[in-house]
Amino acid sequence: MPKIEVKNDDLELALKKFKRVSLEIRRLAQRHEYHLRKGMRLREKRKIAQKKRRKFRNMV
């Protein structure tokens, strides 16, 4: 379980950090759930990068 320190009674910031850390852990576990060939792994990586680009383009 990730450990996050709450500073200056800022619970909102601590909760945001906790969610980010726990999401990274879940993604890592999901990635190692089963074996993917190198080409498939690269395709998945490109797909995720494309989603991130779309997300940040829409924010601007």
Curated annotation (Swiss-Prot):
Cellular component terms (Gene Ontology): ribonucleoprotein complex; ribosome
Keywords noted in UniProt: Ribonucleoprotein, Ribosomal protein
Record keyword Zinc-finger present: no
GO function terms (MF aspect): structural constituent of ribosome
InterPro entries associated with the record: Ribosomal_bS21 (IPR001911)
GO BP: any one term: translation
UniProt xrefs under HAMAP family: Ribosomal_bS21
Family note: Belongs to the bacterial ribosomal protein bS21 family.
Record protein name field: Small ribosomal subunit protein bS21
Source organism (scientific name): Mycoplasma pneumoniae (strain ATCC 29342 / M129 / Subtype 1) (Mycoplasmoides pneumoniae)
Gene assigned in the entry: rpsU
